[in-house]
Swiss-Prot record:
It comes from Gallus gallus. Keywords: Coiled coil, Disulfide bond, EGF-like domain, Extracellular matrix, Glycoprotein, Repeat, Secreted, Signal. Pfam families: FXa_inhibition, Matrilin_ccoil, VWA. Residues 1-23 form the signal peptide. Residues 221-261 form the EGF-like domain. A major component of the extracellular matrix of non-articular cartilage. Binds to type 2 collagens and forms long concatenated protein networks as part of the extracellular matrix. Required for the network-like organization and bundling of collagen fibrils surrounding chondrocytes in the zones of maturation and hypertrophy. Required for mechanotransduction and adaption to mechanical loading in cartilage chondrocytes, resulting in an increase in expression of the extracellular matrix components ACAN and COL2A1. Acts as a moderator of angiogenesis in response to injury. This is Matrilin-1. Transmembrane segments: none annotated. Its main location: secreted.
Length: 493
């Protein structure tokens, strides 16, 4: 019911509520996460380049991952190797058998603050941390051997050969790089496929955002959709440890998260939609191609024509560039072709400047916007803005634009919330990995499905008017009866 207010008498509101005009609040989806038995060793860099407050962020990340595991002698065992110029075994796979003990032990870890001997640390993992004397179990298809390496610098020793030996020994290696880390080194360390095993964040302040990825990586569960253990009305989609509901083409998911309603947005509804896309250097060329696929995924769900949906596209970095205005292309095919041709700008992240452009130009009549047609902006960014966004973000919403904020990687949650329309939880999305933005695209497809008459106000108002007419007629009759009674009383007296 965005942007629509129906002023009704209390009695009528209660009647409508009892008849189910408004849906119940969203229900939580089912969850069931069980981790496959795993010998997990964290290998964490605490060299002098990692400041004490940054090292605390690493400890928070470790704790968050551990919180999502089934910890125990017969399930997941956890060890931690701390390294700099030397290697310190903080605790072994056999040391702690409960989650509470592990979390307390992580909090006691202190940085070593010297050099960066990453190869030495990986060798220690092979020869010591994953040995049976330290609590590792015999190599088996039923038990995962996993190492997570976290580093922020270039190693002072070789990593390629020792990492290859670790992988040959059956150890699956994830490499997380922070800040000015050497990406080539991360690729030498990590297991294949590299896209799944190499992660990068700009700073330790955002490393915690990778938590969800690793919780999902360790989560195994039976297919709840296949077993029928769900309450989706139309389509059930399995996710690690849970499931989500979706709807068939032509339907949109209701607020309860499980039932579907026919969506009239594809036939007869007008919409002016502008994408505001971050093309800064931190996105990287291969990820920018994924962003273009994300845009076209949403475009594919629209009915594009002069009377229905119009699409515009703006890219920004240190400056703002309009790729094409609203209404330039009259069909989906031409829009998608133009998106594919969009060149990557690189450079900085001036989100505030881009939002100002959206407000001042993108939704102007001169750029194809239509008076009286709903305006929707989708802002996509992967990092902290280098300028001020508050005023432009507020103005966009004050003007009635419906704003969605999509963040990936190092995007700042507070900025996403500031951009997003109310209710904020329904208008901002975040993922740590560009490869999963298609999941957000599916959610946005349903969100921007515009109902021709979202709260059926016309019908309700007609009903309200009829009721009020009947009440007025009844009041007039009662007044007439009262006057007659009064006249009779006067005659009797």
């Amino acid at each position: 019911m965005d942007g629509i207010f129906c002023a009704l008498p209390l009695s009528l509101l209660l009647l409508l509520q009892s008849c189910g005009v408004w849906g119940a609040p969203p229900q939580p989806r089912g969850t069931l996460c069980r981790t496959k038995p795993t010998d997990l060793v964290f290998i964490i860099d605490s060299s002098r380049s990692v400041r004490p407050q940054e090292f605390e962020k690493v400890k928070v990340f470790l704790s968050r991952v551990i919180e999502g595991l089934d910890v125990g002698p017969n399930s997941t065992r956890v060890g931690v190797i701390n390294y700099a110029s030397a290697v310190k075994n903080e605790f072994s796979l056999k040391t702690h058998q409960t989650k509470a003990e592990l979390l307390q032990a992580v909090q006691r870890i202190e940085p070593l603050s010297t050099g960066t001997m990453t190869g030495l640390a990986i060798q220690f993992a092979i020869s010591r941390a994953f040995s049976d004397t330290e609590g590792a179990r015999l190599r088996s298809p039923n038990i995962n051997k996993v190492a997570i390496v976290v580093t922020d610098g270039r190693p002072q020793d070789g990593v390629q050969d020792v990492s290859a030996r670790a992988r040959q020994a059956g150890i699956e290696i994830f490499a997380i790089g922070v800040g000015r880390v050497d990406m080539h080194t991360l690729r030498q360390i990590a297991s294949e496929p590299l896209d799944d095993h190499v992660d990068y964040v700009e700073s330790y302040s955002v490393i915690e955002k990778l938590t969800h990825k690793f919780q999902e990586a360790f989560c195994v569960v039976s297919d709840l959709c296949a077993t029928g253990d769900h309450d989706c009305e139309q389509i059930c989609i399995s996710t690690p440890g849970s499931y989500k509901c979706a709807c068939k083409e032509g339907f949109t998911l209701n607020n309860d998260g499980k039932t579907c309603s026919a969506c009239s947005g594809g036939s007869g509804s007008a919409l002016d939609l502008v994408f505001l896309i971050d093309g800064s250097k931190s996105v990287r060329p291969e990820n920018f191609e994924l962003v273009k696929k994300f845009i076209n995924q949403i475009v594919e769900s629209l009915e594009v024509s002069e009377k229905q949906a119009q699409v515009g596209l703006v890219q920004y970095s240190s400056s703002v560039r309009q790729e094409f205005p609203l209404g330039q292309f009259k069909n989906k095919k031409d829009i998608k072709a133009a998106v594919k041709k969009m060149a990557y700008m690189e450079k900085g992240t001036m989100t505030g400047q881009a939002l100002k452009y959206l407000v001042d130009s993108s939704f102007s009549i001169a750029n194809g916007a239509r008076p009286g047609v709903p305006k929707v902006g989708i802002v996509f960014t992967d990092g902290r803005s280098q300028d001020y966004i508050t005023d432009a973000a507020k103005k966009a919403k004050d003007l009635g634009f419906r704003m969605f904020a999509v963040g990936v990687g190092n995007a700042v949650e507070d900025e996403l919330r500031e951009i997003a329309s109310e209710p904020v939880a329904e208008h901002y999305f975040y993922t740590a990995d560009f490869r999963t933005i298609s999941n957000i695209g599916k959610k946005l497809q349903m969100k921007i499905c515009v109902e021709e008459d979202p709260c059926e106000c016309k019908s309700i108002v007609k009903f309200q008017t009829k009721v009020e007419e009947l009440i007025n007629t009844l009041q007039q009759k009662l007044e007439a009866v009262a006057k007659r009674i009064e006249a009779l009383e006067n005659k009797i007296i």
